[in-house]
Amino acid sequence: MSVETQKETLGFQTEVKQLLHLMIHSLYSNKEIFLRELISNASDAADKLRFEALANPELLEGGAELKIRVSFDKEANTVTLEDNGIGMSREDVVTHLGTIAKSGTADFLKNLSGDQKKDSHLIGQFGVGFYSAFIVADKVDVYSRRAGQPASEGVHWSSKGEGEFDVATIDKPERGTRIVLHLKKGEEEFADGWRLRNVIKKYSDHIALPIELPKEFHGEEADKPAEPEWETVNRASALWTRPRAEVKDEEYQEFYKHVAHDFENPLSWSHNKVEGKLEYTSLLYVPGRAPFDLYHREAPRGLKLYVQRVFIMDQADEFLPLYLRFIKGVVDSNDLSLNVSREILQKDPVIDSMKSALTKRVLDMLEKLAKNEPEQYKTFWKNFGQVLKEGPAEDFGNKEKIAGLLRFASTGDDSGEQSVALADYIGRMKEGQDKIYYLTGESYSQVKNSPHLEVFRKKGIEVLLLTDRIDEWLMSYLPEFDGKQFVDVARGDLDLGSLDSEEDKKAQEEVAKSKEGLIERLKKVLDEQVSEVRVSHRLTDSPAILAIGEQDLGLQMRQILEASGQKVPDSKPIFEINPQHPLIEKLDAEPDEDRFGELSHILFDQAALAAGDSLKDPGAYVRRLNKLLVELSA
């Protein structure tokens, strides 16, 4: 044992303490995953060493084969995991093992409910890595030295996972990391070769490095040699380099958990080898749930990049557009150079070709999922639908393909579920209908009862109901689908084309003419609040409604701009009246101009509320309404 110097005791970051406590209790039912997590980290350490050694070969310190060794001591009740990867300096150890440098950590911890099952899913998607050791160990010792540093700059980190850790400088001749788990009482099962072998085969067979265990001798061979003989217990070949026919679903699933640091199986994957002008292999996964930081646009994203099977970088985000940032996986290129950097990636035309092909592959994978496994696609849509809606604005070339993957709620049923594909909508269109009708709003309950839908209900025309905050912005980039134009039913002068008969159109014109006097009176009273007053073609039951001008911003877009601190251009709505409604007939017959003005303002405010808008002067509305109620009850 080497002499320890510069020993100090430090406290864990608050979030680490919380996470340790929650994890030990929430993940206990799946405790064997600690080995998968530690092996995954060791594999990453070897990848990083290979990459840094491209520019600095001395880091390999003699070039012994990179490997991971797992051993155990029944008497001491310990499990030891050792790698000869990049290793850690004292600073690395304090940073990586004492803090969590993830954006959104505090938000993530707030979402934990105390429900063990739910929390285990959340913690799983956060990625626990090293800390999973404390599920089975009551003390963990880490001995490490970073490649390239002298033997005298090794480091020993030790903790019982209870709020603080010790760190000291030691002599460590060999680079890399050795982790010793002092197993808790009751966890002796892991100090066993057969048990460890099974866990490694189950979770880590796909790891490209050899994972070695001491060879066990039985019967006549029971006298073990003093020095252990090591044997490799995993396949030790990069999974994506193997032919698809040879890879089992379980292997694909475990590999996903390794690259994505996820605890759950993916929804789907696509493994593909491209040969010809470009040569690369990709293995892309659609996760089963959204990560907690999906909407943090600065959160790390991207694929693991390898060049000729040599790891180059994590989170290479140049291979997929931002709206597919949830996709996980690996891309291994034969065309890029080994000294490729992020700056080179951003300028290399080869990358553009790969990005285009990989994007198409992901969209094809999603199409296949939607067609063959609609229930799975429903899960996908629930988790990632809003992110996919960013696609039409970002990826003009694939706009139609992305639009085909979108799902919406509609008046076709009362579920409020976003389950209607545009192709389904078109398949149900009425004879003579050549447009796709939609309505945006704050919530499903608000839009499903909107007066804007009255004429559509009467004629049996389906309308898509769009209530996600991004929807109005999305539709500004999606003018049509399959040659059919999108029409916002709350915008402009509604024209149903051939869905209105000639008699209907003639009747509308005559009614509008007969109400010209009323229209003029309303314009005079509401002049400051409206851009226009007209007879409505939308209404059958309500007395009045507000429509948006053809070029004006809708409520959702105004809110988005206001929230981002941008100036919102002033605009006034169009006030439409239903001439057949008894209230409008009474209003038309009202001789007292003051009373006419009060009633007109009440109708205008009610129309604003029905459209989901807020009142500019709610006090005045309440005063007018109370006055009217007093008159009626007199």
UniProtKB/Swiss-Prot annotation:
Main subcellular localisation: cytoplasm
UniProt-annotated stretches for the region A: 1-342
Residue ranges, annotated region (B): 343-559
SMART domains: HATPase_c
GO cellular component, one term: cytosol
Record's keyword terms, sorted: ATP-binding, Chaperone, Cytoplasm, Nucleotide-binding, Stress response
GO biological process, one term: protein folding
Cell compartments where the protein resides: Cytoplasm
The keyword Phosphoprotein is annotated on this UniProt entry: no
InterPro entries attached to this UniProt entry: HATPase_C_sf, Heat_shock_protein_90_CS, HSP90_C, Hsp90_fam, Hsp90_N, Ribosomal_Su5_D2-typ_SF
Pfam families in the cross-refs: HATPase_c_3, HSP90
GO function terms (MF aspect): ATP binding; ATP hydrolysis activity; ATP-dependent protein folding chaperone; unfolded protein binding
Keyword ATP-binding: yes
Lineage: superkingdom: Bacteria
Region described as C: 560-634
Quaternary structure annotation from Swiss-Prot or TrEMBL: Homodimer.
Family statement drawn from the similarity comment of this UniProt entry: Belongs to the heat shock protein 90 family.
Function: Molecular chaperone. Has ATPase activity.
UniProt name for this protein: Chaperone protein HtpG
Source organism (scientific name): Pseudomonas aeruginosa (strain ATCC 15692 / DSM 22644 / CIP 104116 / JCM 14847 / LMG 12228 / 1C / PRS 101 / PAO1)
